[in-house]
Amino acid sequence: MTIYLIRHAQSEFNAVHDLNKPDPMIFDAPITKLGEMQARQARNEVEKLNIKSVIVSPFTRTIQTAQLIFGSKFPFQISAAVREQLCNSCDVGSTPSKLSKNFPLLNFDHLNECWWHEGEKDHRGIAVEPEEVLIERVSIFAEELKSKNIQSTAIVSHGNFIRALTGIKPKNCELIEYVPR
């Protein structure tokens, strides 16, 4: 059973974020021109694989990345389970109605209005998702992968989600082979 994890392409947030500066407050950031190039390069690598289905986080950057890599070859399963840990403004998502307007061929009906982490907000107005909450969410998802025997699937997700699942912090558009244990 092989799963291919792909971190999204460079987003507008990634392009300007500096840990030594304040959060640039770019919510649900789209990908950049460099991100588009990264996704097209990843497509060449992915085309060699025997992928049969694609699970995508509901953030704009992951959907755009998946569309550039896979085109309309597969229907995307949009899953909030593979979303990013909420740490910054870019990790606050868009509502299902806004996503439906931006991506009319995809189905977001199953998502809650607020499908990202909710909790006490910090000085920026961001409800930071604690590491232990991320770990629990990732563990539940990993068990689901095993129990459903999901195979030959690509998951377009995020750095902290992939790190929590594999121990590897991927670069933008990096492909990581994952075998659930």
Roles of regions detected by a PLM:
Residues 39-45, 134-143:
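A short, well-structured juxtamembrane/interface segment
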